[in-house]
Amino acid sequence: MLKTLLAAPALIAAALMSASPLAAADARDARLPGWMAGTWMMEDGAEWSDELWTDARGGIMLGVARTGFGSQLQSWETTQIRVKPDGSVSFFAQPQGKPASEFPMVLRSEEAIEFANANHDYPQRIRYWRQGKLLMAEISRIDGSDAQRWNYRQVVPPQD
């Protein structure tokens, strides 16, 4: 009986923590690809591309990407990977400030994630995965045709 009375406060505290908004946010964040967080860069001759992703927090990861040639910017976009109120995960892309397009998640593993929207013109499929220390990205049509691929290396921020 005494053990039960002593255990009761711990059980109540655990129940309150699991029902707290912080615990709910942590559960949402766990559904996001935290392994993508960081600053990533690719250079191939004069062509360059980079992506920046925030840590998963509050059920969302924010991203920004840009590509260019030499000193000229060719394209840019803002992106989000977020957990929607129904618990599903989607990728949202806004190329050059245009309205956002949604790509629901269709596949997820420890080091890969894929989003698809067959009704979008191009891309229809967006895939990210880790290959060792590289962040790989690919966009294509839903059947995998017209694929474009990037292999990003992580940029380490300067130390103070």
Regions found by a protein language model. Give the residues of each.
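Aromatic-rich beta-strand edge motifs centered on tyrosine
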Residues: E51-A56, R82, Y128-G132, Y152-Q154
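Charged, amphipathic alpha-helical segments
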Residues: D121-Q124
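Bacterial N-terminal signal peptides that target proteins for export
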Residues: M1-P9
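Central antiparallel beta-sheet cores of small beta-barrel/beta-sandwich binding domains
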Residues: A37, M42-N119
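N-terminal helix-cap/turn-to-beta initiation motif at the start of protein domains
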Residues: A25-T39
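Bacterial N-terminal signal peptides
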Residues: A8-A19
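Edge beta-strand at a domain terminus
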Residues: L22, A100, E110, R130-D160
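Signal peptide processing junction and immediate N-terminal pro/mature segment
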Residues: A19-A25
